[in-house]
Amino acid sequence: MKRILFGLLLLTSLVSKAQINVTFYGEPDELKELKTRLLLVEILEENEDVLEKLSKPKKAEELKDYKKFIVDFNADFKVYAQKYWTFTDKMEFKTATEIKDLQKAKNKSYAVLRLIQLNDKGYWGVRTNQNVPALAFTRIESSVAKADSKIYLPSRNLNNDKSLSEADYKYALSILQANVDWIIANNKVLNFDKYAEKMAKENVSKLKGKTLLVEDNMLMKGRSKEQAIKNYGGDLKFVSENELSDALVSKAKNTAVVYTAPYGIVKSNAPFVSVSTIVYFKIIVDCETNEILWLYMPGAMNWGANMSNQITEGEFKVMADLKII
């Protein structure tokens, strides 16, 4: 099952500041209590405003895609939430409207797992309509904008694939729960960015000796696979999306996979110019343990860093040197 439409943009080249809210609003004791609640998995509904915007004949294909997205996402989310959510097996599936009704009744006995959009907050430059998709695990009484915990969703648009695979759900749900468990165990809140960096630094030595799988289309056009393999200096294989996904789902031993996901919006700071774009990080995950082994998440001040959803030969040298960016 692979389906999800997000419509993210490819990177052009810019320098600027992060534009989305990455804060976790749940404190350790609140997250500990949250794990014990009955889980509501939010089912999407068609949005009347979106339907109206797409009602014109020239938008017919977009309307069709939007309606299909709702149906397909809900079907997949039901399956994979039940398969990969381990905090509880007590869950119900409710629409956003039903969850809002429970909120209005001030019912605080539920946790919610939902798809959210991290919108451009306009911290810098002109606010845009760009956003970063994420999954949130949060208290029902919390607002959508102030989720207790969240994780960015992987990007699969390199293949013009309007979808997430089972492996993508496994990656997101497993690491989101691991992030929450770390916060509880250490009595300290780390958002995903900081948590992933910490785990990568602690685990990067485990990357040595593993077979590393990279999706064929992730290598930037015009770049050399031979040079990438030479730079890595280990067992590096370029494979299809299905092969990579199968390895993660089947918990392939001594194998790791490279993922990419959007994590922010950057804007130009040039006078009289307003340009913004989505930026991406790369992450390596152990197929058997779901541990984060490596992270490449450049900040705005990392001049010349590759923030696209593709990878160059240079990043493989960074992997080989066990460096975290």
Predicted stretch roles:
Residues M1-E27:
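Bacterial Sec-dependent N-terminal signal peptides
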